[in-house]
């Protein structure tokens, strides 16, 4: 049976991002946007879309051949009754549609990252999805790229001993919009450990200063999606993750007996094994055949719907990544203090993302 899909939010990630992918990359493969992804995935058909901007909605639906279109997502959910919904609104406008989608009784959800911009909204979304036990997948998609899958299999095979730490490049981009990708990839390569504590120093992106806003109810917000100067995340099983000045989206996994390095957002990998203190040798990294990460995500969601298998980027994976990002903000506001997770005070937010 072909499932009915709908998209809420007809912006860049809903489909037009594919226009930007005009370069060769070993793992960055179209289709990337949601509408082209549904068109390339068997067992699902995109039948409806919603956006509050009627002109944008109609232009987008004309381009992607979507007949049913709504400026009110509630009407879409009530009239179309989709099986699967993508929520691709901006992050600051994502929580309410997501909760509405959950409560409408859909069978599966594909949400973009970052999930939301406040801890209160994070708690609302997690509670709603958990109460309905709905399969969910997430737009931090590097864990679905074949290069990262190959790296995870290489590490799991024990060629370098047990992983001990991840170093990720945070020299460019912003924490919620950009580095949610590479933080999630690092967690995937480390085996998805639970975060225990965070320390961070942040700044504004580019020339902008990072403003801090305190509210009367003890909440705190930063006025833009911040850049990461430095961050350290303590993980269970004595693992750790450090955000460094490596080039943006580069990653190193430090193991007992060597290092695996990913360059250029999974463009290339290099492996060095340590035989003795001053005796290191390069190891070959396996070849891989790239595929669309978006299609892989959608296939994962369909398997969960039909077979009940957990998704690779499920609710706990999403929650962990968001808890880390909010804790970075809390740590920065408190002068880089160590913040234990999960945070008991839930008043952190990011104003403009």
Map each language-model feature to its residues.
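N-terminal Rossmann-like dinucleotide-binding module
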Residues: 1-64
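Conserved SAM-binding strand-loop segment of SAM-dependent methyltransferases
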Residues: 66-73
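Rossmann-like NAD(P)H-binding beta-loop-alpha module
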Residues: 146-165
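Beta-strand-loop-alpha-helix segment that lines the small-molecule cofactor/substrate pocket
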Residues: 83-84, 90-91, 95-143
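C-terminal helix-rich "cap/oligomerization" subdomain common to oxidoreductases
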Residues: 1-3, 7-8, 44, 84-86, ...
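Proline-aspartate-enriched helix->loop->beta-strand connector
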Residues: 66, 81-82, 106, 195
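NAD(P)-dinucleotide binding in Rossmann-like oxidoreductases
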Residues: 222-225, 232-296, 314, 328, ...
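Rossmann-like dinucleotide-binding domain that binds NAD(P)(H)
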Residues: 162-248, 316, 348
